Amino acid sequence: MALAHSLGFPRIGRDRELKKAQEAFWKGELDEAGLRAVGRDLRKTHWELQKNAGIDLLPVGDFAWYDQVLTHSLMFGVIPRRFRPQHGPATLQTLFGMARGVSDGCCGGAHAQEMTKWFDTNYHYLVPEFGADQQFQLGWEQLFEEVEEARALGHAVKPVLIGPLTYLWLGKAKGAEFDKLELLDRLLPLYGQIFQRLAAQGVEWVQIDEPILVLDLPQDWKNAFERAYNQIQREPLKKLLATYFGGLEENLGLAANLPVDGLHIDLVRAPEQYPTILDRLPAYKVLSLGLVNGRNVWRCDLEKALATLQHAHERLGERLWVAPSCSLLHSPVDLDREDQLDAELKSWLAFAVQKCQEVAVLAQAVNQPQARAVLKALEQSRAVQASRAASPRIHKPAVQARVAAITTKDSQRRSAFTQRIAKQRAGLDLPLFPTTTIGSFPQTASIRLARQSFKQGKLSVAEYTEAMHSEIRHAVLVQERLGLDVLVHGEAERNDMVEYFAEQLDGYVFTRFGWVQSYGSRCVKPALIFGDLSRPNAMTVEWIRYAQGLTDKVMKGMLTGPVTMLMWSFPREDVSREVQARQLALAIRDEVLDLEAAGIRIVQIDEAAFREGLPLRRAQWQHYLDWATEVFRLCASGVRDETQIHTHMCYSEFNDVIESIAAMDADVITIETSRSDMELLDAFKAFAYPNEIGPGVYDIHSPRVPDASEMANLLRKAAQRIPAERLWVNPDCGLKTRGWPETEAALVHMVTAARQLRKELA
């Protein structure tokens, strides 16, 4: 009998109940008992949803009040000193303090732990902080309490733990430098204690997640796996080692031979590893095949997956398990909530509940191939695949022909930067250290209300347009009064930097309830790319043209780049990411050319997610970087030399991609640098980056307003690394989340600092 199981389920709830409860608790509108009751109800519902879908072995421990890595930190006693309670054990207040920071109270004020991306997903985890003298102590009873809950409800459960090597890898050494592997022998006894307690609760199987096995691991970490699991094997319970987000590659032999009872592999991301693992797996081990995509929204091709399963079943028999490729945390919860999608498009989709049903039907197809439910599901799957293959909504010959006709010349500016910049400086006539902002201004309650009223039909097109024009007039007047050199229209009409454009492109669709957790209470609802992408009409031109008509100063057009549009959407699975990126690039190229034709002389194309697209394996980086830089140039290279192309990137590591950033050939790049004290510019100096740079002179993520002298000092440091004539002056990022008073105060100081530097260098 093939067994159906799940590696994890979304925790937020079908209607984001967890988010609402968290935020009510933080505001003091819900007490701890109320919050815990919401969590208990969600877990009960989610276990029932999975069981009713046909999952045999339910995950427990995938629920988290904020983040699963943070939950493990509390369980292991990895609580930074600034958050430790003065008396008694850690509490929910401790957990939320670690996640969000503490402004007062028991800790006397403490900044939150660092947050970063969970592998190459759009989920973020709280980075554990380790000291050289780190001690681990079992605390935080959540896992054991939830096992008890599930068993009391009659469920067969499989607790989920992050493995010891992955947990250490994800953390950061704080204070004195030391090797994190030195902590392994101190951490391993806790796993033994956990397994013993779970065994006493009647648990048979435990899932140990070690996704770092799909990374390029140093040899000492590979050696540590053998040492750790040789120790762990002595403890009770059957152990399923789970890997996902990629292929095991050179770690395949290591993973196959670790002394555990089963191995899970991701056959969505790395189907090529299947034949080898089948040959290398010891005869006593269970093999769990991740055949249903856990991080996208499209229905599985059941016949294709079943062919692999049937082959595996011939070799493995009872040792075959079926699962999603990874935790369903990265998928929306339940497609049945979607009541406004048309029937055809909805038939192509599967959210977490439906993915569990697909896993269950695949297992049943192995066990009972002639069962009526199996035959019906396979017939429906064939119909879905045929519908998608032939649908004119998906396949647009004109778009495909345009992509096929792209030439190398299309992604090259007409002249080299040195020639372009001379023409741009002559035409723009900007001072040394020109000042600008990154694009967005504060999104006030009145802006959000106007947008909502328009969507609900309460405002006419004319009324909404006038409301947005009023906001644009205000933004332009403020910038002129403050003395900024290059203005923006403020983006009042934009709800989100991806959604705004996706709503206007053919090939995108939106859901009502397709929410996924980004971190904590922050949920996002990514757009879905379902077909070939094109731009039926101009998207920003009228807003920017209106803004330019209000001022004699240079107005900057603002667009989101193709890579960011792709990375922050659910992509298609039937064509490659680079093909989708090229389609997006052509649509954006048309917009850039329309802006230029409307008299806009600077166009900014934001690529906030450029670095996020990097594959997990270094060997695959260059291919990605080649097409990612090419599609940026494709959307930017149709303009005349006199038109200046800007891009903005907001992350803190450039050294390993600096050549590719240069290859994008943007005339100006604006970046986050204020928190690094301009040290990030060392990468640009060492590489001799040739184009212009706007290093952010203040951190927009903080309400603090730095004074002009502080910003001037940062500019002096920047001028030591980059020639002054190539420096721009701007904030770190957009100002959407800030209030107007602090925005104006900070920009006054920024303009003052720029003027001070001009005097010094005159």
Curated annotation (Swiss-Prot):
Disulfide bonds: none annotated. L-homocysteine binds at residues 438-440, 491, 606. Pathway: Amino-acid biosynthesis; L-methionine biosynthesis via de novo pathway; L-methionine from L-homocysteine (MetE route): step 1/1. GO terms for biological process: methionine biosynthetic process; methylation. 5-methyltetrahydropteroyltri-L-glutamate binds at residues 16-19, 117, 522-523, 568, 612. Keywords: Amino-acid biosynthesis, Metal-binding, Methionine biosynthesis, Methyltransferase, Repeat, Transferase, Zinc. The keyword Secreted does not apply. L-methionine binds at residues 438-440, 491, 606. GO terms for molecular function: 5-methyltetrahydropteroyltriglutamate-homocysteine S-methyltransferase activity; zinc ion binding. SUPFAM superfamilies: UROD/MetE-like. Catalyzes the transfer of a methyl group from 5-methyltetrahydrofolate to homocysteine resulting in methionine formation. This is 5-methyltetrahydropteroyltriglutamate--homocysteine methyltransferase. The gene is metE.
